[in-house]
Amino acid sequence: MTEYPGADLQGCLALSLVIPVFNEVQSIDLFIARVDRVFANEPLVTLELVFVNDGSVDETLVLLLEKQRADPRIRIVDLSRNFGKEAALGAGLQAARGQAVVPIDVGLQGPPGVVLQMIAHWRNGA
């Protein structure tokens, strides 16, 4: 028998946020700043930000590459053309390396603080 232990929910959690982007050069800085504020006081969460560039024709990829050089948490999946949000999410889910993976919108329609609430419920057995 082989046993595969799950995440140590009381210890440090490796969390991947999967962020599909299409022509979002105006939203990326705000998104990263908000995520940084939300997770600044969470020592038990290590973040991986998986941005999936879904064939953007603006400077989205250029900005992401610049951000990645300065921030080792950032990973980029660059799709060859616009495949749509579902395909971008699928590519990001495949690339994510965290113990927990959460898709989130770069436009902040779903506030990142909700992710912390979800983690708290998860750690409490929900």
Regions found by a protein language model. Give the residues of each.
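Structured catalytic core of nucleotide-sugar glycosyltransferases
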Residues: 1-126
